Amino acid sequence: MKQLLLLTSLAVCFSCSDDNNLIVQEYIPTDDASFVGKAVGNFSKEEWFPGGELGTSDDVSPSSYEAPTPATDNQGLTQNFKNGETFFERNFNISTPPFSGLGPAWVRQSCIACHPGYGHGKRQTIYRANDYGNGYLLVVYHPTAGTDALGNSYAANSYVTEVTGMPQTKAAEPFLPPIDESGIHISWPEAAEGALPFTFPDGETYSLIYPVVTIDPEAFHTSPVPTNYECRIESTIGIYGSGLLDAITEDDLREQYRAAAPYCELNPAMWDKAANDFAASAWYTLADGTKAVKRFTYALTRASLQDGAGANAIWNITNVTRSDRHKLYTTDAWARAMSETPSVIDAILADPTSPYRGDGTREGAAQAVKTLLSPTTDQTNNLFHNFAEEMKDRDYYDFMVWHRGLAVPRARNLQSEEVQRGKQLFEEMGCATCHRPSWTTGEDNYWAPENIKAQGALPKYPRQVIYPYTDMLQHRLFMLNDIRTGWCRTTPLWGRGLSLQNTGADDRLHDCRARNVIEAIMWHGYSRESDAFSTTQKFYNLPKADRDAVVAFINAI
């Protein structure tokens, strides 16, 4: 359902939320229509259209993150886009098609629950998967190398194997969730002063907060439970414009790495400094064996959008199977624990319709549970119960039309002298080194799996000049309780100034620790080791009017 007015959209989107601290800002339309598409000050006419001619929407309303690209409409894919959108917005359930197949364990019931208003998740103080806007994924990992309870060795910063990489906190009866939410604790202490004081030279002050997340050992319903673990949280980001980033060529990505390598340390997992080329681990193997360079997610774990975070999430967030995903997103440790839980077996044996009964004995039911909940079992072809595929290929295709077809909202207020001053400072201070303003897409001969190609074409964005404000590389900021590994891909800035009116929140950075743009900038300089410390120091020393101009620029692009 499209949002026409901010207050209406908030009434709809937040009706099931317990968040009483939501900041609602009245939607005030921009007064720049007569300037759009014209060169103004230090902005070219093209900069009004950050997604290029084929990827920009003129919609800057409180539903602007939801608009289709002109390419989607030009290719006659509007109806597919609309159908695909429903699979993003609707709650999946256990048994009623076409949104059936939820579980047996899941992270969220819908995509939009994590991407409120199609944007960035909101900061949370309590972890509840059912709270709208909670875009957090738990990251449970080993801070140091060691050996697990089964004798398997693991490396430092590796994910625990007892729960999934995106851990689940919900499960269908009679199963218990892999992690009990009541055992997850989030606190937000204020940071002590870092490398730069919390008072600007002109007297204005700011503060920084950061998340501390713990999970009680008894909250894990796995066998064995993890040991030597820590937890972080990572929030969802805006998904509009992803198709345009997918259209950047690998040659251009390589040139960006080569241009940056002499001036900063790059993640050795992505860049082989000695060879001056991509590292072996920078390449991702797609379903048909094609090798492609990783470019998506904070951790750079995915290469093609059609096998990227969204294509994966419609399966593993909900555990809804499809023709190319016949297995569950689970762990053997959870499957084993459920097979050993008396209440689970009791409930299964008491239900004559349960697919987990096996031969009807306790031992048979336990074996069926252990097998059917395993991540290695083909759900459609096994010894115990052959489930049907839960998402049709046509619906998955429409979902990917929608995903690749989301437009970037046009820029706003570029005629403003304050915004123009902000752009000048942004470039002079060196912000544009990592937040690279512009790329030009290639021919966009995108990769797609067979179940997509068999249905039709996806939106394409050939030869578009785009302005995402990201170098597509990972950098390190050395923040308190930093992201796992410390390496984080530069988040695109395009459209972020519309976050508050689209989502009801303006939280920034990978875990929403920054409550506004100023805090996001100052976290870049919290540590002298940060890749962005010198740039942040320059911002810190600006007079207030110039700091405000930089913020105005970031909110305009």
Feature names for model-found ranges:
Residues M1-L7:
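Sec-dependent signal peptide recognition
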Residues S9-L10, P98:
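Residue-level detector of alpha-helix boundary/anchor positions
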Residues V12-S15:
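C-terminal motif of bacterial Sec signal peptides marking the signal peptidase cleavage site
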Residues S17-D19:
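Long, low-complexity intrinsically disordered regions enriched in Ser/Thr, Asp/Glu, Pro/Gly
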Residues N21-K82, F92-M400, R404-E417, K423-I557:
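Electron-transfer interface patches adjacent to heme c in soluble/periplasmic c-type cytochromes
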Residues E85:
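N-terminal cofactor/phosphate-binding cores enriched in small/glycine residues
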